[in-house]
Amino acid sequence: MVPPTVEASLESPYTKSYFSPVPSALLEQNDSPIIMGIDEAGRGPVLGPMVYAVAYSTQKYQDETIIPNYEFDDSKKLTDPIRRMLFSKIYQDNEELTQIGYATTCITPLDISRGMSKFPPTRNYNLNEQAHDVTMALIDGVIKQNVKLSHVYVDTVGPPASYQKKLEQRFPGVKFTVAKKADSLYCMVSVASVVAKVTRDILVESLKRDPDEILGSGYPSDPKTVAWLKRNQTSLMGWPANMVRFSWQTCQTLLDDASKNSIPIKWEEQYMDSRKNAAQKTKQLQLQMVAKPVRRKRLRTLDNWYR
């Protein structure tokens, strides 16, 4: 069974979000505060989406059910089968982890690149800004489902103190803890980490044209990923925009290196400007060729008037 977080984003080149139904136990209870964890997967790779996930439950359910019985941790420390098994216990109707709600936003390579490549550069929508906005939209979406959040734990993007202040100002009344390595420190962040990682991994797999295709880890430092980029680079458009983040320096370098074998593209504005400049130069040259020398007027005086 494909996770609903994946189904919501399959085949779309644009950013999509998914919000699970709120577990009825969370809407009915008042005896334990509701806590949330937030984490991402895929911030650094040149391939595939960046996925943000939130997971929430009651403090009591976390302490009495999740922590004693399930091995949630930083998703990078878990094997792929373990991650998928843990997430399946949340989204499948198997009567296991029934009191965990979750939501995801998959920021596609197209939207990441578009945000980071605006002109002029002062208008760039950098990755931190995109991450902050998506995080706040996810929190807001859960609150709009009538979930009364008490405490939110966030794996940091940028300096923890300034980010925490930003979140507290946006959501007064909700307590925030923003920390580095939060996915190893707080259980609900670990749950969110697993949700984000599994969702991203399956989405990246879906991008393969051949099941045996080797993409590598997706990171620009991975020789297998760089080899895939070189192998699949086309002379006109580079790579599919739904797979590759063109704003990454790795892509810029490969495009520049291949410029001799690539098809040059001139935008209409550039073409019109070049024609206008050429016409102006031609006109100036013609004026220079046909211009007649200016005759100086003879100075008339009265020197010889009486002779």
From Swiss-Prot:
Pfam families: RNase_HII
Gene Ontology cellular component terms for the protein in this record: cytoplasm; nucleus; ribonuclease H2 complex
Domain RNase H type-2: 33-260
Location relative to the cell: Cytoplasm; Nucleus
EC number(s) from the headed UniProt entry: 3.1.26.4
Gene Ontology annotations of biological process type: DNA replication, removal of RNA primer; mismatch repair
Entries under InterPro entries matching the protein: RNase_H2_suA, RNase_HII/HIII, RNase_HII/HIII_dom, RNase_HII_hlx-loop-hlx_cap_dom, RNaseH-like_sf, RNaseH_sf
Keyword set, alphabetical order: Cytoplasm, Endonuclease, Hydrolase, Metal-binding, Nuclease, Nucleus
Cofactor(s) required for function per UniProt: Mn(2+); Mg(2+)
Alphabetized GO MF terms: metal ion binding; RNA binding; RNA-DNA hybrid ribonuclease activity
CDD domains associated with the record: RNase_HII_eukaryota_like (cd07181)
Chain positions recorded as a divalent metal cation binding sites: D39, E40, D155
Cofactor binding mode and count: Manganese or magnesium. Binds 1 divalent metal ion per monomer in the absence of substrate. May bind a second metal ion after substrate binding.
Catalytic activity: Endonucleolytic cleavage to 5'-phosphomonoester
Enzymatic class: hydrolase
Other remarks on this protein: Present with 623 molecules/cell in log phase SD medium.
Subunit structure: The RNase 2 complex is a heterotrimer composed of the catalytic subunit RNH201 and of the non-catalytic subunits RNH202 and RNH203.
Summary of the function given for this chain in its UniProt record: Catalytic subunit of RNase HII, an endonuclease that specifically degrades the RNA of RNA:DNA hybrids. Participates in DNA replication, possibly by mediating the removal of lagging-strand Okazaki fragment RNA primers during DNA replication. Mediates the excision of single ribonucleotides from DNA:RNA duplexes.
Family: Belongs to the RNase HII family. Eukaryotic subfamily.
Protein name: Ribonuclease H2 subunit A
Annotated source species: Saccharomyces cerevisiae (strain ATCC 204508 / S288c) (Baker's yeast)
Lineage, highest ranks first: Eukaryota, Fungi, Dikarya, Ascomycota, Saccharomycotina
